[in-house]
C-alpha cells in the first residue's frame, strides 16, 4: 500500500502543479486529488517541501538513469537533466517561480554536485591518478557552478533552447572532457 499511496501522491501533485502555482497548493489539495488521506501523506513525508524534493529526485534519477550516470559524459548527463525540466516545463516553471525557489536552486546545486562527484569517482577508478583534495574540490565546484548557472538561466528564461544545443555549447566552451580536466589537475601533471 505504501508504494501505491506514494505513487498516487506524486501523480496528483504533478497534475496539480501543471494547473496551479506551487504556492496555491496544499497537502489537502494533493491528498484529495490522490484520494489518499492526509495521515498517509504525513506517514511518508514530513512536509510539502520534503515531498516536492522526493518527487524531483525521482524524476531526475529516472531521466539520468543510474547506469548512465557513471558511464556517460558529464555534459550528456546534464542534457538529460535539462531535457527532464523541459519535458515538465509548466511544473518546473511553477516551482522555480514560487516561494520554494531558493530551496529549489539549492536542491539542483546539491544534485548536480553529487552527479559530478560520482562521475569523478568513476573516472579516477577507471584511470587512477593522484589529486589533492583541493584540486578535486576546485574541479567539482567549477563544474557545479557552471551547470547550476546554466540550468537556472535556462529555467528563468523559459526553456526555449533545445537541450542538445546547450550541451553542444557547453562542450565548445569547456573544450575537453572531465577526464582530461582531471588529468590536468592531477599531481602527476605538476
Question: Could you describe each region identified by the protein language model?
Answer:
Residues 2-14, 23-24, 32-35, 42-75, ...:
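An amphipathic alpha-helix adjacent to DNA-recognition modules
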Residues 72-90, 141, 145, 149, ...:
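Amphipathic alpha-helical segments that line or abut small-molecule/effector binding pockets
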Residues 102-128, 134-152, 179:
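Amphipathic alpha-helical packing segments from all-alpha helical-bundle domains
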Residues 13-17, 60, 64, 86, ...:
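Regular secondary-structure segments
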Residues 21-24, 160:
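Residue at a beta-strand N-cap/secondary-structure junction
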Residues 66-67, 89-99, 120-127, 154-158, ...:
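Secondary-structure edge/capping motif, primarily at the C-terminal ends of alpha-helices
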